Amino acid sequence: MGNMIKKASLIALLPLFTAAAAAATDAETSMESGSSSHLKSFLMSVSMIGLSEIGDKTFLIAALMAMRHKRVLVFSAAATSLAIMTILSGVVGHSAVAFLSERYTAFFAGILFLVFGYKLTMEGLEMSKDAGVEEEMAEVEEEIAIKDMNQDMDDVEKGGDTAYDKQLKNASIGKKIVHRIRELASFMFSPVWVQIFLMVFLGELGDRSQISIIAMATDSDYWYVIAGAVIGHAICSGLAVVGGKLLATRISIRTITLASSLLFFIFALMYIYQAFTTQD
């Protein structure tokens, strides 16, 4: 059990190592080629999402819902919701380039990351070393419990399916295929799936990571930023549904918060440097 926790903790800190590697690569190559620029944007996005989302509200929603429903259903709903939110945020961020030059957007993004870094540093220093996510987890559990009450009647209505299942065994192949397609559609768009989708979507709306994606997408490599964020969200959602509640109670929120602040300060320096070296 201890080894599993250690492995989970290492996986949770993997984005931090990725960010360090991306920063080192950027420092070594001041005059970067197109491919290395794409890779830098991609790794920055993955690392930012990884550190921002571990233990976040959307992470806890996926972790707690996975204890009540099928993990595949929870993962598909959470990952789809976050992917759509990320794509919309990226498109909104890149559209700002139409009104401002790349130099100004990079400068504003750098200032934004400085503010985020400062706020996270203050939050981290005010936390105790043993600070956890118990309070936020209790809030999410209460929210889920209220919404689950509306699903109880649906579970009762499924009691008469045995007779239909017997008829299906004797049905033709065509009818069986149609039934499987209908089952898949009802699985993907079931009330539970929609509930998880909306809870994650609304939980991410206006979040620090969403605003960061908007800022990062002002760069010319915005599709790589979007791709990195989508993959980062998918990794975090996967961790959440597999063992998110255990992981969230074992990691140090103070450490994650301070590591995130350091990452935002690094991003701020990179974007401000880009603002002063970019030629319009």
Curated annotation (Swiss-Prot):
<dbReference type="GO" id="GO:0070588">
    <property type="term" value="P:calcium ion transmembrane transport"/>
</dbReference>
<protein>
    <recommendedName>
        <fullName>Divalent cation/proton antiporter GDT1</fullName>
    </recommendedName>
</protein>
<dbReference type="GO" id="GO:0010486">
    <property type="term" value="F:manganese:proton antiporter activity"/>
</dbReference>
<feature type="topological domain" description="Vacuolar">
    <location>
        <begin position="93"/>
        <end position="104"/>
    </location>
</feature>
<dbReference type="GO" id="GO:0005797">
    <property type="term" value="C:Golgi medial cisterna"/>
</dbReference>
<dbReference type="GO" id="GO:0015085">
    <property type="term" value="F:calcium ion transmembrane transporter activity"/>
</dbReference>
<dbReference type="GO" id="GO:0000329">
    <property type="term" value="C:fungal-type vacuole membrane"/>
</dbReference>
<dbReference type="InterPro" id="IPR049555">
    <property type="entry name" value="GDT1-like_CS"/>
</dbReference>
<dbReference type="GO" id="GO:0006874">
    <property type="term" value="P:intracellular calcium ion homeostasis"/>
</dbReference>
<feature type="topological domain" description="Cytoplasmic">
    <location>
        <begin position="1"/>
        <end position="3"/>
    </location>
</feature>
<feature type="transmembrane region" description="Helical">
    <location>
        <begin position="223"/>
        <end position="243"/>
    </location>
</feature>
<feature type="transmembrane region" description="Helical">
    <location>
        <begin position="256"/>
        <end position="276"/>
    </location>
</feature>
<dbReference type="GO" id="GO:0000324">
    <property type="term" value="C:fungal-type vacuole"/>
</dbReference>
<keyword id="KW-0333">Golgi apparatus</keyword>
<feature type="topological domain" description="Cytoplasmic">
    <location>
        <begin position="126"/>
        <end position="183"/>
    </location>
</feature>
<feature type="transmembrane region" description="Helical">
    <location>
        <begin position="105"/>
        <end position="125"/>
    </location>
</feature>
<feature type="topological domain" description="Cytoplasmic">
    <location>
        <begin position="244"/>
        <end position="255"/>
    </location>
</feature>
<keyword id="KW-0050">Antiport</keyword>
<dbReference type="GO" id="GO:0032468">
    <property type="term" value="P:Golgi calcium ion homeostasis"/>
</dbReference>
<feature type="topological domain" description="Vacuolar">
    <location>
        <begin position="277"/>
        <end position="280"/>
    </location>
</feature>
<dbReference type="GO" id="GO:0071421">
    <property type="term" value="P:manganese ion transmembrane transport"/>
</dbReference>
<feature type="transmembrane region" description="Helical">
    <location>
        <begin position="46"/>
        <end position="66"/>
    </location>
</feature>
<comment type="function">
    <text>Divalent cation:proton antiporter that exchanges calcium or manganese ions for protons across the Golgi membrane. Mediates the reversible transport of calcium or manganese to the Golgi lumen driven by the proton gradient and possibly the membrane potential generated by V-ATPase. Provides calcium or manganese cofactors to resident Golgi enzymes and contributes to the maintenance of an acidic luminal Golgi pH required for proper functioning of the secretory pathway. The transport stoichiometry remains to be elucidated.</text>
</comment>
<feature type="transmembrane region" description="Helical">
    <location>
        <begin position="72"/>
        <end position="92"/>
    </location>
</feature>
<keyword id="KW-0813">Transport</keyword>
<dbReference type="GO" id="GO:0005384">
    <property type="term" value="F:manganese ion transmembrane transporter activity"/>
</dbReference>
<feature type="transmembrane region" description="Helical">
    <location>
        <begin position="4"/>
        <end position="24"/>
    </location>
</feature>
<feature type="topological domain" description="Cytoplasmic">
    <location>
        <begin position="67"/>
        <end position="71"/>
    </location>
</feature>
<keyword id="KW-0812">Transmembrane</keyword>
<feature type="topological domain" description="Vacuolar">
    <location>
        <begin position="205"/>
        <end position="222"/>
    </location>
</feature>
<dbReference type="GO" id="GO:0005794">
    <property type="term" value="C:Golgi apparatus"/>
</dbReference>
<dbReference type="GO" id="GO:0015369">
    <property type="term" value="F:calcium:proton antiporter activity"/>
</dbReference>
<dbReference type="GO" id="GO:0032472">
    <property type="term" value="P:Golgi calcium ion transport"/>
</dbReference>
<dbReference type="InterPro" id="IPR001727">
    <property type="entry name" value="GDT1-like"/>
</dbReference>
<dbReference type="Pfam" id="PF01169">
    <property type="entry name" value="GDT1"/>
</dbReference>
<keyword id="KW-1133">Transmembrane helix</keyword>
<dbReference type="GO" id="GO:0005801">
    <property type="term" value="C:cis-Golgi network"/>
</dbReference>
<keyword id="KW-0472">Membrane</keyword>
<feature type="transmembrane region" description="Helical">
    <location>
        <begin position="184"/>
        <end position="204"/>
    </location>
</feature>
<feature type="topological domain" description="Vacuolar">
    <location>
        <begin position="25"/>
        <end position="45"/>
    </location>
</feature>
<dbReference type="GO" id="GO:0030026">
    <property type="term" value="P:intracellular manganese ion homeostasis"/>
</dbReference>
<comment type="similarity">
    <text>Belongs to the GDT1 family.</text>
</comment>
